[in-house]
Structures are given as structure tokens and as C-alpha cells.
């Protein structure tokens, strides 16, 4: 087997074309036969317990169940590897190919992708400009504006609101077309005529659809000639009609047209803003309507640009070829007693194949259109359930009333394929533990449990023991570590001093979800985390767990120090604002530390030469945290306006008393010393800030 090591920079997920799905699943055998289409809903034979041919576990499509052994048993040797059995058509290869070989179902009737027709916003409706998408920008409504600017004569009636809205676009409901739900038969054909007229008007250069108010839609059952219904073929209703309209979209010209339309909306809003500000409900309503039109146009242009950027066609939202994932990813396991446990996906695929084959038989016998439409709707619902169970309508249940697990359920969520199996999988040189707060840590530090550090850094400890001559080989070094000898601790501290670690908290929603720290050994089994970095990780201390990863190469360690340390990730990449900000108990602690006006405390009215003397007295319990004290200041002028009193001493010097200041001067008014009144807590806060900024 040839292993390929192709390098790549990123993975792009986009719409798959029917041709690409066939490339995944369709294979040509040496005898010229094509295999890959799953035609039967059977899984395994109930007598032989072997996969049924052309079924969901077919060995001809997905590969042999047993390595180098065909289905009929004719070939069972390694020397036949690569041979295709002429009797059963199975290729003799490894059974592991059943993990990546795909199949496909050729749908008789195209179906819509449930993610795009039942999403918010509705992508198909935005692209086709139907349902709630307004196509009219009416800024020439002059019936009342010239006579009465504030529109006092205009009364709010149903007909007025109908005139202001383009009601025609609301006729076309894509869900009604796809699921055959409507009041009258003509609604199934509405998109064919309305969009045709709309597209023709745009090709002629019109910016709006109807430039005059359109009457309220009525039931068209009695006003439509019967021959028009008979002239429209049945394959032009439902999903095929939506597919045809999506194929007709010229993406680049639509982008140009929408950009021009957005500019028109913006100019209208800027030009008529004074009128909107002065007017009453009518003009206010018109302003909100234009805002909504512009917002819808912006959403549409984003979808169009994404389609152009990925090289996708909007018609690929309609499925004609349905891929079948490999059987090893949806296994069927035999239990004790002869029963089988199977994945829910097999039941969902079985429903689709059964309904697809039944629809084919109904079309072959020319069944009534009512029955065929019902079968098409059932096929659409079966595909919806496979892709996303419960996205639209009732949730499909299994035999024991348990919701069936669809493809979306396998991918999304905490226990989905991405978060649990890819982002959260176990790797070497990593560990996991609960986090607790470590307020005494520096911002670039974290507390690493001793047991975890011994296990994670074991290779580095062994190398250091051998380099220092404390162990002659790896086996002796491992024995020293297992016996927890005292010589291990200084070696471990030396290793940790120059080796950073990564901390990661799932889900990693942005790049700040993984940051580097310098580890500090702590007792216990919990990781200590600085409280200021919690906002970047979106972490709290109610039982959250974090993963520890060890950078092995010198390049990775250099990247830790240069890019990924917590102090270097001060700003949020989303908006550029600081993401490391004090909150909760830190703010409360700062407030409590600086509270004053508490009288009668220990050490009040004492005088100190500097901040260090205050810290020393507080550490010796000579002061309380809120004691009012006096601290000498450097020679700097402080403007105090209200002089309370002046005292002249025996040496002819004087002391001026202000509200929070005492200044001693000579008889010539030269400054000798000055003291400012504060509290012990404020002195401590000031000392910490000055020491951090290297002012002390």
C-alpha cells in the first residue's frame, strides 16, 4: 500500500457537485463494469449473515468483509491480491477499505437539501428572491406627501399596507413546492411564471419588479385556464423546478446588480432622512422597510460571493445523487443470542432506498399524480431525516421510541465528531485535570500538579539524569522516577524552568483558547490558573477541565515564548479590545482595599517615612487594613485650596493643616516636609503598582 504525504494548509468545506459525488463512489472494474450504486435496501442475508449484493453492505461496492477473501469463497489467498472474482465481482484486497469506500443512491426525483431550504435565513429564498424577499423600492409615493408632510390624512387600513408591500413575492413558498403543501393546485406552478416574468424584467434593465402597487393575491384556481396546467409537465413542479431556476442564475451579474441596488438604498435613506425624522408612522414605516430591503440585499450578496469564491453552483443545493458513507462507519454488530445491533444511519438509508424504488415503480406503471406526489414528498422527508432529523417537522423515532441519530447529530455538539473525536482526542505528551484559581501566580504562570509533571516530562527528566551522571542508562533512570527518589525534584525543577506548556480548554472557538504558560509545581491534582486569563478561555472554576500539552521541538518552544504566552495575548482578535480585565472578586478586592473613613482602628494617625515602612508595620500587625495613617511625600507641590489652620512651633517653623495634607515650612516659607493622609490599603495598592512599573 502506497502512503501519500501530501502537505496542505487548510481544509475547505463546500457544496459537492453530483459529478464529484460520483467520483467519490463510482469505480470501474477491469471487466468494464461500474460499481458504486446502492440499489437494494437489504443489509445482510438472514441465513448466511453475509452482505447482500447491491445492498447497504455490498462487498462488491465497499470491499470484502474479510481481507483477501471474496464473497463466494473462490479466492482466499494472498497471492490473489488485486484480483477481481469473476463469479461475485468482489475485489481481493484488505477489509479496511470498507472504512473509506463510498457508495451512492441515484435519486429518481431530485430533493432539496434541508440545511438550505429550512435555515434562517433561507438560502434558496434569498437567491431566488422569493417568499419574504422584497423586490420593490418605492420612493415615489406622492399621493399624500405633497399635500401633507406628516400624513395626517392617511389612515392605517389593510388596503394601504397591501399597497406598500410587494405581495406577489409572498406567493412563492419553496417549502410548499418541495413538500407539495398548498391551498390550490396552481400554487405548485407559481414559481415557473412569476420568476420568468421577474427575470425578463431584470434582463430589460428594470431595477424593481413592479414599480406600482400590486393587488392582493387571490385564489387562482378559478382564474387559470386548464390548458396552462396541462401544458406544464409534471417534472417542472417541486424540487426540479427550483433546481432549474437556480441553474439560470448568473452569479457575477447578480453580484453587480445587488451592489448597485445597495447603493441606491443607501442614497435614498440619506436623501430622505430629514423627511423620515419629521414624519409620523407612514414615513417611519417606509424607512424601516428600506432598511429591511437593504439588509436582505446584503445577505444575498454574501451568499453569492461565497458561491463564486468556492466555485460552487447554487443548483447543487438540490440533491440528485445521494452519497452513502462507508459501512465501517455505520456498522452492524452481532450480539449474543443471534441478535444484531446496527447504526441508525442504516435504517435511514433503508427508508430512502425503499421509497426511491417505490417511486420508480409508480412512474413505470403511470400511477395517478396524487400518489406520485405523495411518494415524492415521502422521499424528500426521508432525505431530510438522514441529513438532519427534526430540522423540519416531526422527529423520526426508532422501534423503541428513541430519536434516530442523523448525520448532523453525529457531527454537531459536544459529543460530535469534531469536538470529541478530532479536537478532543487523546495525544501523546498531554494530560487533563480540573482547574482551580491561583491568585498568587503571575500572568505568564500556571500551577502544574507534581504527579502530572513527573509523567509528562519523564523523557526530559531521564535525559537530564543521564547527562548529570545520576543514572547510567534509561532503565535505572525510570526506576529512580518510580521510586520517587529525592534527587528527582531538583532535576524536575530545572527542566520546568526552561520548558513552557500549552493549556487548552474545549471548545476552542478562537485562537485564545490555547495559550502558553510557564509551569510552577503545586501540590494536589488540580491545575492552578490565573483569574485574569479566564475570560480568554471562557473558563470558570465550577468544575471546568483543561488539557495540558508539551511542546517538544525547539521551534515549538520558541513559538511559545514569542507568540503564545498569556501576556502577549492581551487583545481580543475579534474586536481589538482588551480581553484581560479585572472583574468580580478582583474589583471587589480593590474596592475593599481602598475603603476609608473608618475611625478608631489600630495604628490610626501614625506617621511613616515611606510606603515600605507601612508594609513592614502591617506585616507585624501594627496596623489594620483600613487604618488612617500619614505618609511622607517627596518634595512636590500639592495644591490644596482650603487651609484649615496653621501652628507655629518653638523653632519658628510652622505646620499648615489642610483636609488630607500637613506641610511643615520654615519661617521663609521653604518646604521642609509634607505628609498626606491615606489608609494602609491604599498604601499597599500604591506600593504594588509602583513596584510593578519599576518606580521603586
From Swiss-Prot:
Binds 1 Mg(2+) ion per subunit. Transmembrane segments: none annotated. It comes from the Eukaryota. Its EC number is 2.7.7.6. Disulfide bonds: none annotated. GO terms for biological process: DNA-templated transcription. Signal peptide: none annotated. The keyword Magnesium applies. GO terms for molecular function: DNA binding; DNA-directed RNA polymerase activity; magnesium ion binding; zinc ion binding. Mg(2+) binds at residues 540, 542, 544. GO terms for cellular component: chloroplast; DNA-directed RNA polymerase complex; mitochondrion. SMART domains: RPOLA_N. InterPro entries: DNA-dir_RpoC_beta_prime, RNA_pol_asu, RNA_pol_N, RNA_pol_Rpb1_1, RNA_pol_Rpb1_3, RNA_pol_Rpb1_3_sf, RNA_pol_Rpb1_clamp_domain, RNApol_RpoC1. It holds the Pfam family RNA_pol_Rpb1_1. Its cofactor is Mg(2+); Zn(2+). Keywords: Chloroplast, DNA-directed RNA polymerase, Magnesium, Metal-binding, Nucleotidyltransferase, Plastid, Transcription, Transferase, Zinc. It catalyses: RNA(n) + a ribonucleoside 5'-triphosphate = RNA(n+1) + diphosphate. HAMAP family: RNApol_bact_RpoC1 (MF_01323). DNA-dependent RNA polymerase catalyzes the transcription of DNA into RNA using the four ribonucleoside triphosphates as substrates. In plastids the minimal PEP RNA polymerase catalytic core is composed of four subunits: alpha, beta, beta', and beta''. When a (nuclear-encoded) sigma factor is associated with the core the holoenzyme is formed, which can initiate transcription. Belongs to the RNA polymerase beta' chain family. RpoC1 subfamily. This is DNA-directed RNA polymerase subunit beta'. It comes from Phaeodactylum tricornutum (strain CCAP 1055/1). The gene is rpoC1.
Amino acid at each position: 500500500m502506497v502512503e501519500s504525504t501530501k502537505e496542505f494548509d487548510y481544509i475547505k468545506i463546500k457544496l459537492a457537485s453530483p459529478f464529484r459525488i460520483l467520483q467519490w463512489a463510482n469505480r470501474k472494474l477491469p471487466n468494464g463494469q461500474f460499481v458504486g450504486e446502492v440499489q437494494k435496501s437489504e443489509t445482510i442475508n438472514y441465513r448466511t449473515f453475509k452482505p447482500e449484493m447491491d445492498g447497504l453492505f455490498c462487498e462488491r461496492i465497499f470491499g470484502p468483509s474479510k481481507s483477501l477473501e471474496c464473497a463466494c469463497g473462490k479466492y482466499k489467498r494472498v497471492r490473489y491480491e488485486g484480483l477481481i472474482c469473476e463469479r461475485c465481482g468482489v475485489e481481493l484486497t484488505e477489509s479496511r477499505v470498507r472504512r473509506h469506500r463510498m457508495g451512492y443512491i441515484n435519486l429518481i426525483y431530485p430533493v432539496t437539501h434541508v440545511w438550505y431550504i429550512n435555515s434562517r435565513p433561507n438560502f434558496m429564498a434569498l437567491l431566488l428572491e422569493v417568499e419574504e424577499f422584497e423586490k420593490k423600492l418605492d420612493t415615489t409615493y406622492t399621493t399624500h406627501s405633497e399635500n401633507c408632510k406628516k400624513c395626517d390624512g392617511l389612515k392605517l387600513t389593510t388596503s394601504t399596507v397591501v399597497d406598500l408591500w410587494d405581495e406577489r413575492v409572498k406567493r412563492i413558498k419553496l417549502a410548499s413546492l418541495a413538500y407539495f403543501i398548498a391551498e390550490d393546485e396552481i400554487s405548485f406552478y407559481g414559481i415557473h411564471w412569476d420568476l420568468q416574468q421577474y427575470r425578463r424584467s431584470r434582463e430589460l434593465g428594470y431595477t424593481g419588479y413592479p414599480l406600482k402597487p400590486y393587488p392582493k393575491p387571490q385564489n387562482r384556481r378559478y382564474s387559470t385556464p386548464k390548458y396552462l396546467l396541462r401544458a406544464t409537465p409534471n417534472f417542472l413542479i417541486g424540487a426540479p423546478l427550483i433546481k432549474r431556476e437556480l441553474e439560470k442564475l448568473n452569479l457575477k451579474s447578480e453580484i453587480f446588480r445587488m451592489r448597485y441596488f445597495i447603493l441606491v438604498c443607501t442614497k435614498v435613506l440619506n436623501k430622505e432622512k430629514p423627511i423620515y425624522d419629521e414624519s409620523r408612522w407612514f414615513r417611519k414605516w417606509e424607512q424601516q422597510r428600506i432598511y429591511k430591503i437593504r439588509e436582505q440585499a446584503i445577505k444575498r450578496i454574501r451568499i453569492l460571493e461565497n458561491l463564486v469564491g468556492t466555485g460552487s453552483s447554487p443548483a447543487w443545493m438540490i440533491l440528485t445523487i445521494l452519497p452513502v458513507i462507508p459501512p465501517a462507519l455505520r456498522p452492524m454488530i452481532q450480539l449474543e443470542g443471534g441478535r444484531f445491533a446496527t447504526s441508525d444511519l442504516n435504517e435511514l438509508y433503508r427508508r430512502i432506498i425503499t421509497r426511491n424504488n417505490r417511486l420508480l415503480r409508480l412512474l413505470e406503471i403511470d400511477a395517478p399524480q396524487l400518489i406520485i406526489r405523495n411518494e415524492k414528498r415521502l422521499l424528500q422527508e426521508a432525505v431530510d431525516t438522514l441529513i438532519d432529523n427534526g430540522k423540519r417537522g416531526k422527529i423520526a423515532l426508532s422501534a423503541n421510541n428513541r430519536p434516530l441519530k442523523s448525520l448532523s447529530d453525529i457531527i454537531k455538539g459536544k459529543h460530535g465528531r469534531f469536538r470529541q473525536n478530532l479536537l478532543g482526542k487523546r495525544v501523546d505528551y498531554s494530560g487533563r485535570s480540573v482547574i482551580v484559581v491561583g491568585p498568587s501566580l503571575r500572568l505568564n504562570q500556571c500551577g502544574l500538579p507534581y504527579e502530572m509533571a513527573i509523567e509528562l516530562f519523564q523523557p526530559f527528566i531521564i535525559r537530564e539524569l543521564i547527562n548529570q551522571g545520576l543514572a547510567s542508562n534509561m532503565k535505572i533512570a525510570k526506576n529512580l522516577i518510580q521510586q520517587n527518589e529525592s534527587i528527582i525534584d531538583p532535576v524536575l525543577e530545572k527542566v520546568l524552568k526552561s520548558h513552557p506548556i500549552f493549556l487548552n480548554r474545549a471548545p476552542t472557538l478562537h485562537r485564545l483558547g490555547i495559550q502558553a504558560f510557564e509551569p510552577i509545581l503545586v501540590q494536589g491534582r488540580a491545575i492552578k490558573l490565573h483569574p485574569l486569563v479566564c475570560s480568554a478561555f471562557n473558563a470558570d472554576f465550577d468544575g471546568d477541565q483543561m488539557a495540558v500539552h508539551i511542546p517538544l521541538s525547539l521551534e515549538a518552544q520558541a513559538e511559545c515564548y514569542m507568540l503564545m504566552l498569556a501576556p502577549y495575548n492581551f487583545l481580543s482578535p475579534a474586536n481589538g479590545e482588551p480581553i484581560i480585565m479585572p472583574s468580580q472578586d478582583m474589583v471587589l478586592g480593590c474596592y475593599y482595599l481602598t475603603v476609608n473613613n473608618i475611625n478608631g482602628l489600630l495604628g490610626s494617625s501614625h506617621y511613616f517615612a515611606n510606603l515600605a515602612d507601612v508594609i513592614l508595620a502591617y506585616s507585624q500587625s501594627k496596623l489594620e487594613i483600613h487604618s488612617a495613617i500619614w505618609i511622607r511625600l517627596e518634595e512636590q507641590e500639592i495644591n490644596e485650596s482650603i487651609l484649615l489652620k496653621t501652628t507655629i512651633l518653638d523653632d519658628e517653623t510652622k505646620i499648615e493643616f489642610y483636609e488630607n495634607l500637613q506641610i511643615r515650612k520654615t519661617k521663609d516659607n521653604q518646604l521642609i516636609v509634607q505628609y498626606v493622609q491615606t489608609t494602609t490599603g491604599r498604601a499597599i495598592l500604591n506600593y504594588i503598582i509602583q513596584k510593578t512599573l519599576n518606580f521603586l
